[in-house]
From Swiss-Prot:
GO terms for cellular component: chloroplast; small ribosomal subunit. Belongs to the bacterial ribosomal protein bS16 family. It comes from Thalassiosira pseudonana (Marine diatom). Its main location: plastid. It is found in: Plastid, Chloroplast. InterPro entries: Ribosomal_bS16 (IPR000307), Ribosomal_bS16_CS (IPR020592), Ribosomal_bS16_dom_sf (IPR023803). One of its GO terms (molecular function) is structural constituent of ribosome. This is Small ribosomal subunit protein bS16c.
Length: 79
C-alpha cells in the first residue's frame, strides 16, 4: 500500500522534511516513488505540488495523520 508521508532530511536538531509517496513497508528514509513537496517545521516554510498530490490521492494513496493535518492546514484537503 502506498502512503503519502514525511521523509526526514537536514542536520541534527534542524529537521526538514520532504513530502513523498512511499510503500508503507519502506523504512523512513528509503527510496520514494515520488516527491511531492517539502516542509520545514522550524521556519514553517512549506511547498506542496498540488497537481501531484491530487493525482496520487485519486490513485488511492493514504496520507499519514501528520501529512493529513499539514494538507488540511494548507487547504489542499477539504473535509
Amino acid at each position: 500500500m502506498l502512503k503519502l508521508r514525511l521523509k526526514r532530511n537536514g542536520r541534527k536538531r534542524q529537521p526538514a522534511y520532504r513530502l513523498v509517496i512511499m510503500e508503507s513497508t519502506t523504512r523512513r528514509n528509503g527510496r520514494p516513488v515520488d516527491e511531492v513537496g517539502y516542509y520545514n517545521p522550524i521556519t514553517k516554510e512549506s511547498y506542496f505540488n498540488k497537481e501531484k498530490i491530487v493525482k496520487w490521492l485519486s490513485y488511492g494513496v493514504q496520507p499519514t495523520e501528520t501529512v493529513f493535518q499539514l494538507l488540511k492546514k494548507s487547504n489542499l484537503i477539504e473535509i
